[in-house]
Amino acid sequence: MEVRGSFLAACRRRMATWRKNRDKDGFSNPGYRVRQKDLGMIHKAAIAGDVNKVMESILLRLNDLNDRDKKNRTALLLACAHGRPGVVADLVARKCQLNLTDSENRTALIKAVQCQEEVCASILLEHGANPNVRDMYGNTALHYAIDNENISMARKLLAYGADIEARSQDGHTSLLLAVNRKKEQMVAFLLKKKPDLTAIDNFGRTALILAARNGSTSVVYQLLQHNIDVFCQDISGWTAEDYAVASKFQAIRGMISEYKANKRCKSLQNSNSEQDLEMTSEGEQERLEGCESSQPQVEEKMKKCRNKKMEVSRNVHADDSDNYNDDVDELIHKIKNRKPDNHQSPGKENGEFDRLARKTSNEKSKVKSQIYFTDDLNDISGSSEKTSEDDELPYSDDENFMLLIEQSGMECKDFVSLSKSKNATAACGRSIEDQKCYCERLKVKFQKMKNNISVLQKVLSETDKTKSQSEHQNLQGKKKLCNLRFILQQQEEERIKAEELYEKDIEELKIMEEQYRTQTEVKKQSKLTLKSLEVELKTVRSNSNQNFHTHERERDLWQENHLMRDEIARLRLEIDTIKHQNQETENKYFKDIEIIKENNEDLEKTLKRNEEALTKTITRYSKELNVLMDENTMLNSELQKEKQSMSRLETEMESYRCRLAAALCDHDQRQSSKRDLQLAFQSTVNEWCHLQEDTNSHIQILSQQLSKAESTSSGLETELHYEREALKEKTLHIEHMQGVLSRTQRRLEDIEHMYQNDQPILEKYVRKQQSVEDGLFQLQSQNLLYQQQCNDARKKADNQEKTIINIQVKCEDTVEKLQAECRKLEENNKGLMKECTLLKERQCQYEKEKEEREVVRRQLQREVDDALNKQLLLEAMLEISSERRINLEDEAQSLKKKLGQMRSQVCMKLSMSTVTL
């Protein structure tokens, strides 16, 4: 249990370190942490996706295109991270720098790929962004596309020149990263691009080793199909098969061992086919020569047969080959020792040959039974390699048998033995022909499967091309839509500006109307004054006949009349000038209104054209998209059917493969690996137990020492506490006695004062004074005793304090640590105080600004009052031109109606355009 607990603790430690270091590869936290205080105006607009504000900040020169915020980020980086393609297109069109990096050395393209903003990334790639820039972790944009398993993005990056062999700080290429992250679809896509399969990471691991270590069987299968090296080792000397065995991934181990066995069988097939051709040609020549062959030729043939039999039996079992070779050696030895003039009977020799023939037939049956037994173990019905071996075995045995017959035929001519041998040879020939036909059928099937695979690969490549073309067309359509939206925004801005100009013109017309009113009022007043003067003149003339004495008054009135006429003439001139100015301004405004109408008509026409073009493009692209979607569904269905046929064909191919050599090799490797693992496990367990015992004993000793030290310190602390309490009590008693002494001294002083005042009474108190002095003496003696006791207690306390100092020294370390933490807290408090002071300063500034605003407000109020006074004067003058105003009002109302109609039409068209979009 202790070993298990320590093992779990070690695992927890490793997990903790892994959690600390998991962010070191750069694939976590793709977005930015945004705070408003770190951003400028252009950065806020880029995050919000407001193209107009971005344009305003650039046109007003508040920010530059490539300005950075406080976190070293440009507007392009923030727009790509937050997925704002309109802002990205605008910034790219204004020719900002595309390859500027942030604090982690990441470009805008890397951020767009990392945040899976494909539209932004495609805009950057089309305008020449570099796809091979590496960040501080050594990752390129392709690495982040692989981590997100975004195949379309990876295809675009590779199309624009991304390096498929670029390495990160861990030494991972794109293929190694996809395998390590278990991205199966991405691995299949990258293998089509033919990457370097021999690439290794910083630990010397290939893609196959990483796949076997992670337990991804489909990735291992794909890599084995591309003929990856199975025997590569990492830094620790482990192969992919070793990792599969250690992690108990039996399926992966079986696939790798089968791949090795297939390689060995192919090499054996190639060597055996060459030897079969040589043997068949030599056998035909020997049969043509007949029974006239000599003794050395027989020896050579027997040696060849022995070599052939050794090769076949070595693949099946080693023991049978040794027995057979011994028998063949005995036969050769007997043939060599035989003389031409021996007198042995032919029957004995025939018996020996029959015995040897029986042995060969028995060995042949043994070999076949062993082959069938191994086939039953591996559940294989029949493969091409097995049939080739079956072809070789009977042929070699038949050749041995024919050699024996030819050797025996030189000395005996038994008809029965010859007929038996002919029947055996005919049966063997038939079996060989049947097996050859079976092999030819298998070859034809294999070629058909190869042709099907090539056709499927072509279809897959064509589908990939069509997909890439469709994606490219989609991107072009999106670009055009973005451009059209941008044009519409510009047109809307122009329309808004025209409306603003129109509103300004209306305001100016209102001002002119007010001026006309004032003028009309002035005219009315002047007319009234004229009428009153004329009435006065009439009255004066009527009275002139009656009163001669009023002649002087008439003269005065005549002068006044003359002056009034001059004023009236002057006022008429002013009215004429005002009318002339009003006519000129009216003409100007009419011209401006006509120009605005023409501009509105042009804008309406352009809007109609744009709407028509938009509707046409949208319908066209929708039709193309529907067609492409239909084609894509058809191709996907065909692909699924072809994949099913491929899987069926692959299963058939696997059923035709041989696993004989792999079974034997796997058995040996299993036994050796089991032994090694058991030994290593036992050694590690022993070492772990030994270390655990040492650590436990050391911990127990330390805990005992700690408990002792704690007990001693607690005892000393209690003693110190008691002594301090005793000291406090004694000091309190001394203070009380000192207070009593001070009181008695005060009483003595009072008594002396009374004695000086009242001498006769003094005699009465002499005796009392003596008694008091006696009491004082006693008190002083008690005080001395108490002081001695205090000194003794202090000495004891000093001795105890010396013992406590040692304990306090130990405690001071902890106190220092606490003080350090307190200092840190004080520093934090200082920082907070600084922030508070800054906030106070800002508050003061705000109050000052508030006061300044109040001053400005007062000034504006004064100006408003002056303007009101002026307005009153103008109103007085505008009353004169009221008749003109009525006509202008009618015209203005008609213009307003027309403008309202125009606005409603424009709004309807804009709503229609938005609906179509």
From Swiss-Prot:
Keywords: ANK repeat, Coiled coil, Repeat. Residues 439-669, 778-906 form a coiled coil. Residues 298-320, 330-342, 349-366 have a biased composition (Basic and acidic residues). InterPro entries: Ankyrin_repeat_domain, Ankyrin_rpt, Ankyrin_rpt-contain_sf, CC144C-like_CC_dom. Gene3D superfamilies: Ankyrin repeat-containing domain (1.25.40.20). It comes from the Eukaryota. ANK repeats lie at residues 71-100, 104-133, 137-166, 170-199, 203-232. PROSITE patterns: ANK_REP_REGION (PS50297), ANK_REPEAT (PS50088). Residues 265-367 are annotated as: Disordered. This is Ankyrin repeat domain-containing protein 62.
